[in-house]
Design a protein with these regions (language model features):
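Short hydrophobic/aromatic beta-strand micro-patches
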Residues: 84
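Glycine- and aspartate-rich repeat motifs characteristic of hemolysin/RTX-like Ca2+-binding segments
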Residues: 80
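N-terminal regions immediately upstream of nucleotidyltransferase
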Residues: 1-76, 87-96, 122
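Conserved catalytic core of two-metal-ion nucleotidyltransferases
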Residues: 42-45, 64, 98-152
Length: 152
């Protein structure tokens, strides 16, 4: 059994760990700003995606508030986003849908410059603000199609 002093020490250690593991408010705000900007670009009226009423939403640890700092100083924070289209042409394959989203990202000067090599399932934007390791994150954008009419 632990005594009151030991419990307080453990609580303090856990608080410090929580503060050091969680992303900072600045990091969170930068990620939110980026996610919203990408969403605005992918859903704007001029977009090739517009006719499919895309919905852009964060996923994974970011949406549930458990995003953590990277352990390796060369790594960055991971932000997962889904670009959900409501419908598609009947002849489209998964590759066609992914290419449509990639084309829209490449049509934006900033996103084209930070677009990583094509991934297997998603597009990745690599943000490197001022070269500061604490301001590095990447956004994985996963194209999807809502075929059931149900969405989160």
């Amino acid at each position: 059994m632990i005594n009151l002093n030991q419990k307080q020490e453990i609580d303090e250690i856990l608080d410090i760990l929580g503060e050091n593991l969680s992303i900072t408010e600045t990091q969170h705000n930068a990620a939110v700003q980026s996610y919203k900007a990408v969403g605005n670009w992918l859903t704007n009226e001029e977009s090739e995606l517009a006719r499919y009423s895309p919905v852009i939403s964060p996923q994974g640890s970011f949406i549930i508030g458990t995003t953590i700092q990277s352990i390796n100083p060369d790594d960055d924070i991971d932000l997962d986003v889904v670009c959900e289209l409501n419908g598609k042409r009947p002849d489209w394959t998964q590759k066609d849908i992914k290419e449509l989203v990639g084309d829209q990202l490449r049509n934006h000067k900033k996103y084209e410059s930070i677009l990583d090599d094509e991934g297997r399932r998603c597009w990745t934007l690599k943000y490197r603000e001022n070269g500061n390791p604490n301001e590095r994150y990447h956004m994985d954008i996963l194209p999807a199609v809502n075929t059931t009419g149900y969405s989160i």
